[in-house]
């Protein structure tokens, strides 16, 4: 597996986005299948593992933490806060909350579920526009100083927002959808990443498989290298 530089880390060029193990597009795999997928990814040389508090309303991080705890030193573990499931009388709903106290709570919950003392790369999942980006990133900077996270990333932000955030604390990565169909990062974000030394971490390079002719569910057919 080829590698790339991601902030202070050397990671596999292809990472495993874990969202679909418990959340979002189509029927998620069983926990047993999810475990097999995670272990197969490690076998194939994947070292970049990406999850979030939102995915499965915590179930995704719990699965990743349980399965990958024995391999913690072999991976760069990424998660996200600022968007999570919140309990309401009519069920759990997605809430964007970038207040410092919410981010601290999200991080502590993620550390517990992931069974780790520190998250390598912690993204602000979405910018809460009711909260200045400087306040949200300032809270994440405090988590770096406290040893809870090692580095900070942003997800789905504009170039202008990236520059504002980077002025508070170095941003090592911007996660954004990028594919043949979705080219939004080319509108200034790629240039901003280059100028600031931040990596662009592209998700859904196959546009969530919505334009593919078939889906692949047999992990025994996954290629051994990339």
Model-derived regions, located:
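Generic structural signal for well-ordered alpha-helices
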Residues: 1, 38, 61, 65, ...
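N-terminal binding-site loop/beta-alpha segment at the start of enzyme catalytic domains
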Residues: 1-79, 207
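Conserved, mostly hydrophobic/aromatic
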Residues: 6, 16, 34, 41, ...
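Active-site mouth loops of central-metabolism enzymes
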Residues: 20-32, 89-104, 125, 130
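Short, acidic/polar
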Residues: 28-41, 96-114, 158-164
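Active-site groove signature of glycoside hydrolases
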Residues: 111-129
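Beta/alpha (TIM)-barrel catalytic core signal, keyed to glycine-rich beta->alpha loops juxtaposed to Asp/Glu
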Residues: 127-211, 221
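Conserved small/polar residues in nucleotide/adenosyl-binding loops
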Residues: 210-214, 226
């Amino acid at each position: 597996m080829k590698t790339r530089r991601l902030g202070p880390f050397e990671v596999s060029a292809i990472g495993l986005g874990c969202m679909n193990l418990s959340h979002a597009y189509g029927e998620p795999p069983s926990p047993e299948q999810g475990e097999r997928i995670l272990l197969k990814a490690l076998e194939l040389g994947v070292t970049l593992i990406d999850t979030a508090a939102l995915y499965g309303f915590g179930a995704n991080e719990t699965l990743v933490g349980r399965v990958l705890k024995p391999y913690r030193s072999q991976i760069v573990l990424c998660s996200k806060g600022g968007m999570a499931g919140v309990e309401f009388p009519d069920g759990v709903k997605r809430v964007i909350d970038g207040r410092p106290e919410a981010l601290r709570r999200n991080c502590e919950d993620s550390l517990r579920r992931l069974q780790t003392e520190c998250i390598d790369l912690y993204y602000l999942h979405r910018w809460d526009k009711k909260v200045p980006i400087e306040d949200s990133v300032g809270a994440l900077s405090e988590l770096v100083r406290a040893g809870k996270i090692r580095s900070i990333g942003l997800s789905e932000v504009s170039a202008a927002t990236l520059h504002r955030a980077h002025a508070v604390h170095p941003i090592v990565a911007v996660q954004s959808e990028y594919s043949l169909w979705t080219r939004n990062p080319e509108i200034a974000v790629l240039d901003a990443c280059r100028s600031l030394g931040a990596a662009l971490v592209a998700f859904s390079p196959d546009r969530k498989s919505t334009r593919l002719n078939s889906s692949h569910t047999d992990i025994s057919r996954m290629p051994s290298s990339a």
